[in-house]
């Protein structure tokens, strides 16, 4: 039997790598992406099983997205897409009044446009397998935190687009997940100079994501903390 195939963006570190490690250990074949080719190669070299093609590039690049789609097809077709790659933009985060339009455009391209475009490219594969689209969101998508307007509005757009996709593709499962605070470089960039050593490791979120994939509840928005509470 062929292994199920997952495409995971932003998989060289943090939550992307933690989930990739878990899925690889459970027999999945992975197509993983990140911008830093060397870091991605080091990360994927630790993954069990395989094959796990590492495709370095920027998710905002249409050529790179097509390559991800083609590599997934070569492995047999994707059953799961995890849109995890993300950016905060400037660090420290600026107020809306100080948000440069070019920076905001980049936030939208990475956090909203690229996930939607990659999803569209993989839809034929996902439809054939009644697959899953897992979009990593944030509480900033629903809460009005000062200086988080650029990132939060991009993630809010992703949340709503996910709801529309779920309505249009009822055979798929389309999830947005708020993972909560994590001890990641991205979180450190959001709070430069702050000690974040008390934040949970990304690996602590993986059981919640695994529960979604195993149980296939209705499409929707979920908080990792709630999923963990149900599991326990």
Residue ranges and their predicted role:
Residues 171-172, 176-179, 184, 192-232:
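C-terminal helical subdomain
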Residues 37, 56-68, 101:
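The beta1-alpha1 cofactor-binding region of Rossmann-like NAD(H)/NADP(H)-dependent oxidoreductases
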